[in-house]
From Swiss-Prot:
Source species: Photorhabdus laumondii subsp. laumondii (strain DSM 15139 / CIP 105565 / TT01)
Enzyme Commission number, as recorded: 1.14.12.17
Full protein name: Flavohemoprotein
SUPFAM superfamilies xref list: Ferredoxin reductase-like, C-terminal NADP-linked domain, Globin-like, Riboflavin synthase domain-like
TM segment ranges: none
Job description of the protein: Is involved in NO detoxification in an aerobic process, termed nitric oxide dioxygenase (NOD) reaction that utilizes O(2) and NAD(P)H to convert NO to nitrate, which protects the bacterium from various noxious nitrogen compounds. Therefore, plays a central role in the inducible response to nitrosative stress.
A GO term, aspect molecular function: oxygen carrier activity
């Protein structure tokens, strides 16, 4: 535990940190990658270029300083980050490297003196121990689970299937022929790739898109115009090729009782964790109302529509509503989609106000902000709202 003087000293730096903004974390990452370039094989360097990771780390540092005397407030964020770290196979020695560069960054930017540096050193040590212990629990639990493993495991691509003009699904089976551990609906895999065309090893997280079966995993990947990994997977990786995976991770998953009504909301490739949730509900014979709301650019970008339709036929409590922003001539309203334009939840006002209904959603950040605002404006309590960001976490 931290003493009162250390807590007060760390809190005294909040105005300085806030005034500096993400310049602090930009300096930190630049320094760390210069002195420890091997870490480029762990971090998603695309998020370094667009600034998302710098902003996320800056927000995390400020949140830690502000709540250092009440760490329970940070537990949800710790859980999310710990799962992400476990998917990246982060080890205790990585925390020592990060701590060294964090303190050096504070010293180089502010020259705050030994008292502040010592306080931040103690504070970082406490936080690092929290993460190290939680991540070890995640690793150990995975090892003990039937079909589980620690670290990386080689898989082969069993099946590659086009799901839309921009989305391909990939089914992986372990090369050792063994079982694979179950996962919670909404969780993700990390895929590790190395290629001569890459500057570094690349690691990406992709949501699982089916129900657990003990023998294989399925994900879906959207081709991003500048995406190093997504284009490689779409264009280069074929059935029979090898990839390396860490075990399923993630703190965003369906967690409701059988009698709970639920609405699954998505846009674009954000439907991938919802597919896993929908298959789970079908597998469990969920008999309470299920609303499936999805937004796509048009029919050519609408993935998994046939799979969802098949599940819908088997579940009388299922109600699907689709929005196409710009339907093509061949997209038929009432058959392929119900509404044109952006997702307007007021058309389902009464259905969404079912008592005790939970809402899970995923998609582009602007879409999720738009959805969250509509739900809150309807009077939906925050405790019933759950969401997942692809990439560094943002508060919606």
């Amino acid at each position: 535990m931290l003493d009162n003087q250390t807590i007060a000293t760390v809190k005294s730096t909040i105005p300085l940190l806030s005034a500096t903004g993400p310049k602090l974390t930009a300096h930190f990452y630049e320094r760390m990658f210069k002195h420890n370039p091997e870490l480029k094989n762990i971090f998603n360097m695309s998020h370094q270029l667009n600034g998302d990771q710098r902003e996320a780390l800056f927000n995390a540092i400020c949140a830690y300083a502000a709540n250092i005397d009440n760490l329970k407030v940070l537990l949800p964020a710790v859980e999310k980050i710990a799962h992400k770290h476990a998917s990246l196979n982060i080890q205790p020695e990585h925390y020592q490297i990060v701590g060294t560069h964090l303190l050096a960054t504070l010293n180089e930017m502010f020259q705050p003196g030994n008292e502040i540096l010592d306080a931040w050193g103690k504070a970082y040590g406490v936080l690092a121990d929290i993460f190290i212990n939680r991540e070890e629990q995640i690793y150990h639990s995975g090892e003990l689970t039937d079909g589980g493993w620690r670290g990386l495991r080689p898989f082969r691509i069993n099946r590659k299937e086009v799901k839309s003009e921009v989305i391909c699904s990939f089914e992986f089976a372990p090369q050792d022929g063994g079982k694979v551990m179950d996962y919670k609906p909404g969780q993700y895999l990390s895929i590790y790739l190395q290629d001569d065309s890459f500057a570094n090893r690349e690691i990406r997280q992709y949501s699982l898109t089916a129900a657990p079966n003990g023998s294989s995993y399925r994900i879906a990947i959207k081709r991003e115009p500048q995406g190093i990994v997504s284009n490689h997977m779409h264009d280069k990786m074929q059935e029979g090729d090898t990839v390396w995976l860490t075990a399923p991770r993630g703190d965003f998953f369906l967690d409701i009782k059988p009698e709970t009504p639920v609405t699954l909301i998505s846009a674009g490739v954000g439907l991938t964790p919802m597919m896993s949730m929908l298959y789970h509900l079908h597998q469990q014979n969920h008999n309470s109302p299920i609303n499936w709301l999805h937004a796509a650019e048009h029919g050519g970008h609408h993935a998994f529509s046939h799979e969802v339709a098949a599940i819908a036929q088997a579940m009388p409590n299922f109600a699907g509503t689709i929005w196409y922003r710009e339907p093509r001539d061949e997209d038929q309203q009432g058959i392929h989609y119900q509404h044109k334009g952006f997702m307007d939840l007021t058309v389902l006002n009464e259905a969404l106000k079912t008592e005790g209904m939970h809402f899970y959603f995923c998609g582009p950040v602007a879409f999720m902000q738009y959805v969250a605002k509509q739900l809150l404006d309807m009077g939906i309590d925050k405790q019933f709202i759950h969401y997942e960001c692809f990439g560094p976490h943002k508060v919606i």
